[in-house]
Curated annotation (Swiss-Prot):
It holds the Pfam family CTP_transf_like. One of its GO terms (molecular function) is ATP binding. The gene is coaD. It comes from Thermotoga petrophila (strain ATCC BAA-488 / DSM 13995 / JCM 10881 / RKU-1). Homohexamer. ATP binds at residues 8-9, 16, 87-89, 97, 122-128. Its cofactor is Mg(2+). This is Phosphopantetheine adenylyltransferase. InterPro entries: Cyt_trans-like (IPR004821), PPAT (IPR001980), Rossmann-like_a/b/a_fold (IPR014729). The keyword Nucleotidyltransferase applies.
Length: 161
């Protein structure tokens, strides 16, 4: 069975990677789908995020990375995929995730959203926290893959130029 794990991934963190590995133990194929979230201002472009995720996941099989502009359910219908994977960190995630899952179900009735509970050791990590700490010169190497730590450094240097 095929599933899609959609998100902003701005940038991908070890929390995301954990969800991806666990989803791969449940599903035969997983598409990590980089999407635009109009509620968020992103540091990396969609293509930069896609490339970074591909680098980070290069050793894993059964996973593909793609980008999508527009409505998520359109992508799912086009590719014949009926399962969405999302991660839940804390009760604060629940309200938004519930709203999105119900809205997507209204738009595509065959769709099921599967929630994986974040692992305890990663549950405090978010892309926004990573960006904030990196911006002020803090060490984020325990929260993101090495490729991401390097990309963050580069991006911040670019910003200072
Ligand atoms: P979006 O803008 O779509 O919420 P994110 O990249 O912030 O995109 O998150 C994508 C998904 O990954 C969401 O379901 C989110 O709850 C989940 N997620 C984010 N960080 C973690 C983490 N540290 N552990 C587990 N799941 C996470």
């Amino acid at each position: 069975m095929k599933a899609v794990y959609p998100g902003s991934f701005d940038p991908i963190t070890l929390g995301h990677v954990d969800i991806i590995k666990r989803a791969l133990s449940i599903f035969d194929e997983l598409v990590v789908l980089v999407t635009e979230n109009p509620r968020k201002k992103c540091m990396f472009t969609l293509e930069e995020r896609k490339k970074l995720i591909e680098e980070v996941l290069s050793d894993l099989s059964g996973v593909k990375v793609d980008v999508h502009h527009g409505l998520l359910v359109d992508y799912l219908k086009k590719h014949g995929i009926k399962v969405l994977v999302r991660g839940l960190r804390a009760v604060t995630d629940y309200e938004y995730e519930l709203q999105m899952a119900l809205a997507n179900k209204k738009l595509y009735s065959d769709l099921e959203t599967v929630f994986l509970i974040a692992s305890e050791k990663f549950s405090f990590i978010s892309s926004s926290l990573v960006k904030e700490v990196a911006l002020y010169g803090g060490d984020v190497t325990e929260w993101v893959p090495p490729e991401v730590a390097r990309a963050l450094n580069e991006k911040l240097k670019e910003g200072k130029r």
